[in-house]
Amino acid sequence: MRAQPDLKPRSRDVTDGLERAAARGMLRAVGMTDADWEKPQIGVASSWNEITPCNLSLDRLAQAAKEGVHAAGGYPLEFATISVSDGISMGHEGMHFSLISREVIADSVETVFMAERFDGAVLLAGCDKSEPGMLMAAARLDLAAVFLYAGSTLPGKLGDRDINIVDAFEAVGGCLRGLVSREEVDAIERNFCPVEGACAGMFTANTMASAAEALGMSLPGSASPPAPDRRRDGFARASGEAVVNLLRRGITARDIMTREAFENAIAVVMALGGSTNAVLHLLAIAREANVDLAIDDFNRIGDRVPHLADVKPFGRYVMSDVDRVGGVPVVMKALLDAGLLHGDCLTVTGKTVAENLADITPPDPDGKVIHALTQPIHRTGGLAILRGSLAPDGAVVKTAGLESTFFEGTARVFDGEEAAMRAVPELRPGDVVVIRYEGPKGGPGMREMLAVTGAIKGAGLGKDVLLVTDGRFSGGTTGFCVAHVAPEAVDGGPIAFVRDGDRIRLDAQARTLDLLVDADELAKRRADWQPPPPRYTTGVAAKYVKLVGSASEGAICR
């Protein structure tokens, strides 16, 4: 915090003095008057679009956020940034650009704030990469900032059955194997997404919204209400008020996003059994906040934080059920009471985590959606970092979805997702599907493999086939699936030298992933290896390849 904070630490550059007559004239044309020049200017950045249901609520929420800014004595100015729909981009060339969009969002928001000299930020997002992109921008800018999630959709209904987007991907695999009819696939397609909002389960969007709340960058309780729920409008207004109050107190994003706050976010992700993408994104956000966070910190925290949430893709419930029993604060209170959270971390309310939880008095875990710490689903957290001869720099597995922690099988190697998808009807129990050249550089963009993993599970092979990739998985992925293998294939990591018939061993309990080929043979293969030519030689993807680093460090651009 800073003594006697200036409410207009940056916007005076465009409002004060004779030299700024032209700037003031432009601002008058968008509605500002003489009475507004002394008000802090708050940028309201939104990833609203009509491309995907994930973002549809943001237009409404941005209006409410602006009302809150006005009510608190600030002046809001709204602008939009891009967003990519992972659900629509899955399984084809478009997915190369999903992770790239995270960097574009962070860069574009930073660019507008730096150019227009806004004093504070309300950041609204609904999709998997727009959430971390916004938080990365907040960390870079280090202004007073509040993040608000668009909210999730409600589960669809097919007869008496609740369905979601993962059911659609799995139905495709079942259809390819003759286990599900084309008519059943069509019925799921028409019913799984009934209203606006992000995917309903504890997939990447809901995981990152929960992480943002635990990090202290969102208002308590704001992650879980569904997108159509009008409580979100109240959270939006309160977010607008909160950012002005942060300015008054001189609290900026990096005052909130400390190492201890990131440890809180990791703890909540572990307790929820959240998406493997949280590893990638939290590492990237921490880097922008100048926080020293490493991939092995996830195991350190996961060792002591139990898995508590029985949520999809591996469990029975969705985010609206989490909301029904009290939301993310229920998990945070349980962890705080057990000494597993840092209660003294500052948040966007201007209060600490412990003070927030005392104010709202969340209920105890209900025992079904959220288990008590004394009766966890798993004794340790829902994610694990693996190392071994196949992943010297690390890999990630969602242990929350594993019925067994050990698998050894025979490699079936595919250079790219499409070849693996074509082979799904031919897979057999005991196969280890290796999909390579899908890393941050090699893909580029670390494509998510939900089309393949969903097809494998839908084909009835989810417990009998291991999938290993230097790409990523959707938050909707569950089962024997290992991602973020590093070093990636295009950098000459061991995954580049795997051949059909090699034996691969996963031991999630020991946290190892090994290629059972002797060192001399691997050395011969390495000597004969040449990386493939780049997929893109122009445009944003070509630029991204030149800048992006390893998944083990968050796939950040340097």
Curated annotation (Swiss-Prot):
The keyword Iron applies. The keyword Iron applies. InterPro entries: DHAD_IlvD/Edd, Dihydro-acid_dehy_C, DihydroxyA_deHydtase, DiOHA_6PGluconate_deHydtase_CS, ILV_EDD_C, ILV_EDD_N, IlvD/EDD_N. Keywords: 2Fe-2S, Amino-acid biosynthesis, Branched-chain amino acid biosynthesis, Iron, Iron-sulfur, Lyase, Magnesium, Metal-binding. Its cofactor is [2Fe-2S] cluster; Mg(2+). The modification N6-carboxylysine is found at K129. Pathway: Amino-acid biosynthesis; L-isoleucine biosynthesis; L-isoleucine from 2-oxobutanoate: step 3/4; Amino-acid biosynthesis; L-valine biosynthesis; L-valine from pyruvate: step 3/4. The active site is at S474 (proton acceptor). Pfam families: ILV_EDD_C (PF24877), ILVD_EDD_N (PF00920). One of its GO terms (molecular function) is 2 iron, 2 sulfur cluster binding. It is an enzyme of class 4 (lyase). One of its GO terms (biological process) is L-valine biosynthetic process. Binds 1 [2Fe-2S] cluster per subunit. This cluster acts as a Lewis acid cofactor. SUPFAM superfamilies: IlvD/EDD N-terminal domain-like, LeuD/IlvD-like. Homodimer. Belongs to the IlvD/Edd family. HAMAP family: IlvD (MF_00012). This is Dihydroxy-acid dehydratase. It comes from Acidothermus cellulolyticus (strain ATCC 43068 / DSM 8971 / 11B).
